[in-house]
């Protein structure tokens, strides 16, 4: 029987221009399980994903501990991002179950 534990999955949708900034923060907080993909969609201010517009969005999924997930959400929603309000950047979270034997979730860099 597989034993699972609860981890936090943070999903961040961001303007591609913020990629390096967000990736550095994710790594500095110790999250080591993440991936990203290019996405398109519509928000309050624009439709993105037009290959001729030069705009791009990324969807990043991070699976980490509850504590690290909370720190990442706090950072994304902090006042420092008020200066980045013209960029697409939002996040949401849910709980996921991971195999308890998977040490990469709790590994800290």
Feature roles, as predicted:
Residues 1-109:
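Positively charged, small/polar-rich N-terminal and surface patches that mediate targeting and assembly
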């Amino acid at each position: 029987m597989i034993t699972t534990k609860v981890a936090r999955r943070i999903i961040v949708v961001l303007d591609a221009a913020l990629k390096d900034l967000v990736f550095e923060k994710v790594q500095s907080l110790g999250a080591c399980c993440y991936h990203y993909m290019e996405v398109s969609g519509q928000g309050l201010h624009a439709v993105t994903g037009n290959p001729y517009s030069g705009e791009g969005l990324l969807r990043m999924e991070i699976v980490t501990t509850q504590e690290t997930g909370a720190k990442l959400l706090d950072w994304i929603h902090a006042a420092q991002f008020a200066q980045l309000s013209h960029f697409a950047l939002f996040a949401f979270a849910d709980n996921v179950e991971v195999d308890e034997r998977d040490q990469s979730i709790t590994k800290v860099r």
